[in-house]
């Protein structure tokens, strides 16, 4: 089984058209294998209009890849960051202005805290065999500096609160402790009054002026 280097360098790079195939490698056999980082970017109505709703088919997958490739080409800022260990793609983190994610905007559990124009992290994926080695935390840290360069005032994540162990399939938005270790702070607890079937989430934030703790083994370029 492949493992991330203990003493090597973890490189974190913006998603580009040439790296879309690397995202597919990361997402394979994970929660996002059929999502292609589009779950929160479209409402159900928009998914139907875009031809990506319903059961996954080869046509659906090709269409989702096409949409992610289009996002990777935009000039105002990458749609995410890709992590590499010794040149091997090992992680992907979705990133962008909150307005890029209609499903987040509509979510009661992830409602806006204030009027700060934040960027958000709706999904974090690390390949099997590379988990538990700090890849996710390094990617979260990297979002703050990257978003700041693009003019973002802050970055937010909507994490599972600390406490009961979270299954990997339910941790795609990260955990509270993960964000804390990346230098984020909790600015709101679980929204009260939500239906029991809602996934509990806490809002974590780092401002552009925050200096997240960085690892000497990771770099972004």
Enumerate the predicted regions with their spans.
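Conserved GNAT acetyl-CoA-binding A-motif
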Residues: 140, 147-170
């Amino acid at each position: 089984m492949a493992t991330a280097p203990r003493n090597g360098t973890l490189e974190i790079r913006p998603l580009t058209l040439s790296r879309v195939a690397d995202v597919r490698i990361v997402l394979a056999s994970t929660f996002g294998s059929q999502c292609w980082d589009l779950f929160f970017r479209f409402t159900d109505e928009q998914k139907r209009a875009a031809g990506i709703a319903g059961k996954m088919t080869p046509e659906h997958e090709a269409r989702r890849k096409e949409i992610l490739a289009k996002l990777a080409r935009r000039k105002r800022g990458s749609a995410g960051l890709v992590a590499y260990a010794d040149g091997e793609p090992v992680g992907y983190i979705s990133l962008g202005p909150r307005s890029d994610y209609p499903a987040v905007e509509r979510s009661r559990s992830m409602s806006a805290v204030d009027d700060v124009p934040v960027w958000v992290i709706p999904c974090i994926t690390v390949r099997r065999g590379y988990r538990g080695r700090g890849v996710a935390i390094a990617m979260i840290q990297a979002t703050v500096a990257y978003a700041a360069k693009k003019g973002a005032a802050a970055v937010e994540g909507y994490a599972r609160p600390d406490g009961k162990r979270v299954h990997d399939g339910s941790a795609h938005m990260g955990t509270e402790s993960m964000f804390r270790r990346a230098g984020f702070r909790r600015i709101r607890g679980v929204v009260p009054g939500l239906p029991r079937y809602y996934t509990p989430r806490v809002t974590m934030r780092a401002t552009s002026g925050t200096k997240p703790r960085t690892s000497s083994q990771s770099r972004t370029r």
